């Protein structure tokens, strides 16, 4: 882009004086790519030309300017103005102001309501850019260059509120919900078990490490800070690119400024599955159990496959991954809805799905909570994620299907292994087939024999499909027909491998004799990219 600035002819007087005699005009051949900031006190520059949304920053940072134009941030002012519900206090989050950056006092639009400050521009997150454009080559110092923060909690000197300044509150509680979610607590694998400093865990438990693992090279305020006090959870900017969305195969940007797609059934490319796929099959050289196998489970490719395992791949792979649920994980775990007063219809609150709970318990005002102890009934929880695609007709139907699936999983897993003393070790104090197998020589639970025995494979699947640490976490609901197919095959293999095991309980035998759940076949949204289920 050409910019016109003043160019003066200057030369050595002895050589140029004859040429310049009588010459007093000045020709305009360039223009400085910077306008004086409307709010000179803060140094917020804003738009270079507001009519075509050319930011001052974008005169040099061309790639970021181009990507930003495709975001909702670039139309934030017009969106608010055209909403019919704009209030004066709303504009600071739809313009360049002190919201979203480290500027403490009212600045930008809050100080000077100029069109140069319309929309959520670069400086909304980075802070004032005037010092940087005046001294772009100056050694790095506080505020120059102005770096945005990836942290959002604002609970330390190195964590500004950034996104939280605007993406919070009753109408858009993204950070309010996120702060209660497991993504905010990712530094610990479970309460008291800190894992963010473990190199093998950090890329999925610490925000900066995740960005590095995904090849993000953009600089930000916390990037070079070391020490556990500067660790970040899975904050907004880990999943969302503030500069603009990644592109689909056809060149169009992804929705929501996401770094990776959420609708691709490939565990290595799907945003959620980049972490939720760590260990979904047993390791013949170690006794480690499953760890975050949700992605492969959803796609129909998780678990130990007993000998001859060859289920109806269409059924097990398409349970929650069919064309009716194109957003896959996010289709159930990121569900937005508005709560209104039942008597008047007036707005009360909004949920934006950033607790990442598919069927959360409801508080007295109808807003989801992090409580996981309420009943699995149509009234105690919200089932909107289950009913919105039309797969489950209403909340009562969805709750009944969920309860039935969990009961079948409980019956099958306890028949295989009931860890009565809750020590996660198969021993003779437990119940189920594995408690009988553990007493049979030679030992069937050796991590050093280079094989996965039928007993070890069954143990892996039970660990994966029960609500236990590291497992699928849904009691098989991510893919109930794959879960049931695996457990039924485990039981058959155990009976064939270890003669003398007792007869099955009556209701388990009934499950074994019946069809594989109430399978309703639907076509996959696209062919599986991950490895299909095959017999071993």
Mark where each language-model region is.
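Sec-dependent bacterial lipoprotein signal peptides
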Residues: 1-21
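Short sequence/structural segments immediately N-terminal
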Residues: 23-308, 319-347, 356, 360-363, ...
């Amino acid at each position: 882009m050409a910019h016109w600035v003043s160019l003066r002819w200057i030369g050595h007087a002895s050589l140029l004086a004859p040429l310049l005699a009588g010459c007093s005009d000045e020709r305009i051949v360039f223009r400085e790519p910077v306008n004086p900031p409307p709010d000179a006190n803060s140094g917020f520059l804003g738009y270079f030309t507001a009519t075509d949304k050319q930011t001052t920053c974008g005169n040099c940072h061309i790639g970021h300017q181009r990507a930003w134009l495709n975001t909702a941030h670039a139309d934030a002012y017009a969106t608010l103005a055209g909403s019919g519900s704009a209030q004066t206090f709303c504009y600071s989050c739809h313009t360049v102001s002190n919201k979203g950056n480290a500027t403490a006092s009212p600045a930008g639009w809050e100080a000077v309501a100029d069109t140069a400050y319309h929309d959520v521009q670069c400086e909304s997150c980075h802070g004032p850019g005037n010092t940087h454009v005046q001294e772009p080559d100056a050694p790095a110092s506080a505020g120059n260059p102005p770096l945005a923060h990836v942290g959002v909690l604002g609970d330390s000197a190195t964590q500004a509120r950034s996104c939280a300044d605007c993406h919070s509150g009753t109408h858009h509680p993204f950070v309010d919900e996120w702060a209660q979610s497991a993504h905010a607590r990712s530094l610990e694998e479970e309460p008291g078990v800190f894992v963010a400093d473990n190199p093998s865990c950090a890329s999925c438990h610490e925000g900066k490490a995740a960005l590095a693992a995904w090849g993000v090279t953009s600089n930000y305020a916390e990037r070079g800070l070391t020490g556990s006090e500067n660790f970040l959870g899975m904050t907004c900017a880990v999943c969302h690119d503030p500069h603009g969305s990644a592109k689909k195969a056809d060149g169009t940007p992804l929705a929501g400024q996401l770094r990776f797609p959420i609708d691709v059934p490939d565990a290595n490319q799907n945003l959620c599955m980049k972490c939720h796929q760590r260990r979904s099959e047993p390791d013949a050289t170690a006794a480690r159990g499953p760890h975050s196998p949700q992605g492969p489970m959803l796609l129909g490719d998780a678990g130990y496959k007993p000998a001859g395992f060859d289920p109806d791949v269409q059924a097990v792979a398409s349970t929650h991954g069919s064309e009716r649920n194109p957003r896959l994980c996010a289709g159930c775990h990121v569900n937005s809805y508005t709560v209104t007063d039942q008597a008047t219809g007036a707005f009360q609150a909004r949920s934006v799905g950033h607790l990442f709970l598919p069927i959360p318990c409801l508080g007295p005002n109808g807003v989801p909570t992090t409580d996981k102890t309420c009943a699995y009934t149509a009234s105690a929880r919200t089932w909107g994620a289950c009913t919105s695609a039309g797969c489950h007709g209403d909340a009562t139907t969805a709750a009944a299907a969920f309860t039935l699936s969990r009961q079948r999983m409980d019956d099958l897993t306890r028949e295989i292994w009931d860890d009565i003393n809750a020590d996660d070790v198969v021993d003779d104090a437990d119940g189920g087939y594995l408690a009988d197998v553990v007493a049979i020589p030679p030992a069937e639970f050796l991590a050093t024999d280079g094989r996965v025995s039928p007993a070890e494979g069954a143990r892996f699947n039970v660990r994966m499909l029960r609500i236990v640490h590291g497992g699928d976490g849904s009691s098989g609901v991510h893919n109930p027909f794959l879960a049931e197919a695996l457990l039924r095959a485990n039981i058959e293999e155990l009976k064939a491998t270890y003669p003398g095991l007792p007869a099955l309980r009556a209701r388990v035998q009934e499950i074994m004799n019946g069809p594989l759940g109430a399978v309703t076949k639907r076509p996959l949204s696209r062919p599986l990219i991950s490895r299909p289920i095959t017999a071993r």
